């Protein structure tokens, strides 16, 4: 099954779960995603403050996630680019801001996997999970790129790195596969 076919199937699953999806075809196929998530702190408080030095002090903002999925031609694995926005409009551009959003176990994985750079789905930069880490994950799984569950398994890795930010896409895929 081609990567484009897998992206189209993934887009159907995500759309059913309320994730906005758009297939963009430049020189390559890129699936653009958007979703919203509200993060709770350990006390379920609803606090959001922005410090003077612009480092996010964050308990429970509404986070809007923009993401792009493409096939990395160099590493031959899917690549996940993303840009979170606090309360709909404030882009989170500092590593400290991203780490404040992640669960403890995800922070450890994210430390080695996250980078920021040019995003092929936009004219700007975005965060991304480095494809060499993704390649290591697939080598451990020993799964073929043609396997119909390839992208679903890859999303589980993305979720390990970015939990709880990616919970809505995991739920959408899980719900679609159960129905």
UniProtKB/Swiss-Prot annotation:
Coiled coil: none annotated. It is a peripheral membrane protein. GO terms for biological process: autophagosome assembly; macroautophagy; mitophagy; protein modification by small protein conjugation; protein transport. It holds the Pfam family Autophagy_act_C. The active site is at residue 132. Keywords: Autophagy, Cytoplasm, Membrane, Nucleus, Protein transport, Transferase, Transport, Ubl conjugation pathway. The keyword Protein transport applies. It comes from the Eukaryota. Its EC number is 2.3.2.-. GO terms for cellular component: cytosol; nucleus; phagophore assembly site membrane. It is found in: Cytoplasm; Nucleus; Preautophagosomal structure membrane. One of its GO terms (molecular function) is Atg12 conjugating enzyme activity. Belongs to the ATG10 family. E2-like enzyme required for the cytoplasm to vacuole transport (Cvt), autophagy and nucleophagy. Acts as an E2-like enzyme that catalyzes the conjugation of ATG12 to ATG5. ATG12 conjugation to ATG5 is required for proper localization of ATG8 to the preautophagosomal structure (PAS). Likely serves as an ATG5-recognition molecule. Forms homooligomers. Interacts with ATG7 and ATG12. This is Ubiquitin-like-conjugating enzyme ATG10. It comes from Schizosaccharomyces pombe (strain 972 / ATCC 24843) (Fission yeast). The gene is ATG10.
